[in-house]
Amino acid sequence: MQELVTLECTEARKEGKPVSRYLTTRNKKTVTERIEKKKYNPHLKRHTLHKEIK
């Protein structure tokens, strides 16, 4: 079963910039741990680590 999850930038708050968020899906049965992906943050103008939030 696919579940909608939100990925949030981990570096933006440290630098005082707005956070960037992405929506993606994951399969709850096969992927039990939280997702971490490198995605582009337009506020920082570079790729940063984005982690799944609840």
UniProtKB/Swiss-Prot annotation:
NCBIfam families: PRK00504.1, PRK00595.1, rpmG_bact. Belongs to the bacterial ribosomal protein bL33 family. The gene is rpmG. GO terms for biological process: translation. One of its GO terms (molecular function) is structural constituent of ribosome. InterPro entries: Ribosomal_bL33, Ribosomal_bL33_sf, Ribosomal_zn-bd. This is Large ribosomal subunit protein bL33. SUPFAM superfamilies: Zn-binding ribosomal proteins. Transmembrane segments: none annotated. GO terms for cellular component: cytoplasm; ribonucleoprotein complex; ribosome. It comes from the Bacteria. The lineage of its organism: Bacteria, Pseudomonadati, Verrucomicrobiota, Opitutia, Opitutales. It holds the Pfam family Ribosomal_L33. Keywords: Ribonucleoprotein, Ribosomal protein. It comes from Opitutus terrae (strain DSM 11246 / JCM 15787 / PB90-1).
